[in-house]
Amino acid sequence: MHVHVVEHPLAAARLTTLRDARSDNAAFRTALRDLTLMLVYEATGSVPVESSTVRTPVAETTGYRLANPPLLVPVLRAGLGMVDQAHALIPEARVGFVGMARDEDTWQPTPYLESLPADLSAQPVFVLDPMLATGGSMVYTLELLHARGAADITMLCVVAAPQGVTAIQECAERFGPSTSVRLFTATIDEGLNDAAYIVPGLGDAGDRQFGPR
């Protein structure tokens, strides 16, 4: 599995805003949108393109577009804050949804929504989730996508914990070499606290975007 940490001054600045407990909901959402743009930009750097001839006001030239735009899959509810900006950069992309809630006693994911195409065998997928903590929600999502035939899966996360990275690496190994799994993140933090929150992290990304449940 390929893991790429986006190292850029602008990404670091937006991450600082997300971490800052003084940032209100609006500031948090704005920083998340900006950082999502950077993650998508990095993640699409090597995707296949197809060429075509276009005419400018003065001449013909060669233009390019994505050969096979990805399916965007935000993991609800925190992933909602990433999907609009990802869609803005890839307007031809389709969008699916996976809804997940965390059991605060067991820390295990409780799925409540799956809205995905039945056949993903020829479809690249971008999974959008700001936080990769224990990895439970992401592993569930990866397994769901793999069961539908997805063989090219890219995860975009703002903050990751080593435990979560290990969990998805083990999941990718179970899929075997026929499935490509990549992670793009702005940082890999120190670890998890006793409540399974990322440290230093940025708190609950859903609450900080939309308010408490």
Swiss-Prot record:
<dbReference type="InterPro" id="IPR034332">
    <property type="entry name" value="Upp_B"/>
</dbReference>
<dbReference type="Pfam" id="PF14681">
    <property type="entry name" value="UPRTase"/>
</dbReference>
<dbReference type="GO" id="GO:0044206">
    <property type="term" value="P:UMP salvage"/>
</dbReference>
<feature type="binding site">
    <location>
        <position position="102"/>
    </location>
    <ligand>
        <name>5-phospho-alpha-D-ribose 1-diphosphate</name>
    </ligand>
</feature>
<dbReference type="InterPro" id="IPR050054">
    <property type="entry name" value="UPRTase/APRTase"/>
</dbReference>
<keyword id="KW-0328">Glycosyltransferase</keyword>
<feature type="binding site">
    <location>
        <position position="198"/>
    </location>
    <ligand>
        <name>uracil</name>
    </ligand>
</feature>
<dbReference type="GO" id="GO:0006223">
    <property type="term" value="P:uracil salvage"/>
</dbReference>
<feature type="binding site">
    <location>
        <begin position="129"/>
        <end position="137"/>
    </location>
    <ligand>
        <name>5-phospho-alpha-D-ribose 1-diphosphate</name>
    </ligand>
</feature>
<comment type="pathway">
    <text>Pyrimidine metabolism; UMP biosynthesis via salvage pathway; UMP from uracil: step 1/1.</text>
</comment>
<dbReference type="InterPro" id="IPR000836">
    <property type="entry name" value="PRibTrfase_dom"/>
</dbReference>
<feature type="binding site">
    <location>
        <begin position="203"/>
        <end position="205"/>
    </location>
    <ligand>
        <name>uracil</name>
    </ligand>
</feature>
<comment type="similarity">
    <text>Belongs to the UPRTase family.</text>
</comment>
<keyword id="KW-0808">Transferase</keyword>
<comment type="function">
    <text>Catalyzes the conversion of uracil and 5-phospho-alpha-D-ribose 1-diphosphate (PRPP) to UMP and diphosphate.</text>
</comment>
<feature type="binding site">
    <location>
        <position position="77"/>
    </location>
    <ligand>
        <name>5-phospho-alpha-D-ribose 1-diphosphate</name>
    </ligand>
</feature>
<dbReference type="GO" id="GO:0000287">
    <property type="term" value="F:magnesium ion binding"/>
</dbReference>
<keyword id="KW-0547">Nucleotide-binding</keyword>
<feature type="binding site">
    <location>
        <position position="204"/>
    </location>
    <ligand>
        <name>5-phospho-alpha-D-ribose 1-diphosphate</name>
    </ligand>
</feature>
<dbReference type="InterPro" id="IPR005765">
    <property type="entry name" value="Ura_phspho_trans"/>
</dbReference>
<keyword id="KW-0460">Magnesium</keyword>
<dbReference type="GO" id="GO:0004845">
    <property type="term" value="F:uracil phosphoribosyltransferase activity"/>
</dbReference>
<keyword id="KW-0342">GTP-binding</keyword>
<dbReference type="GO" id="GO:0005525">
    <property type="term" value="F:GTP binding"/>
</dbReference>
<dbReference type="InterPro" id="IPR029057">
    <property type="entry name" value="PRTase-like"/>
</dbReference>
<keyword id="KW-0021">Allosteric enzyme</keyword>
<protein>
    <recommendedName>
        <fullName>Uracil phosphoribosyltransferase</fullName>
        <ecNumber>2.4.2.9</ecNumber>
    </recommendedName>
</protein>
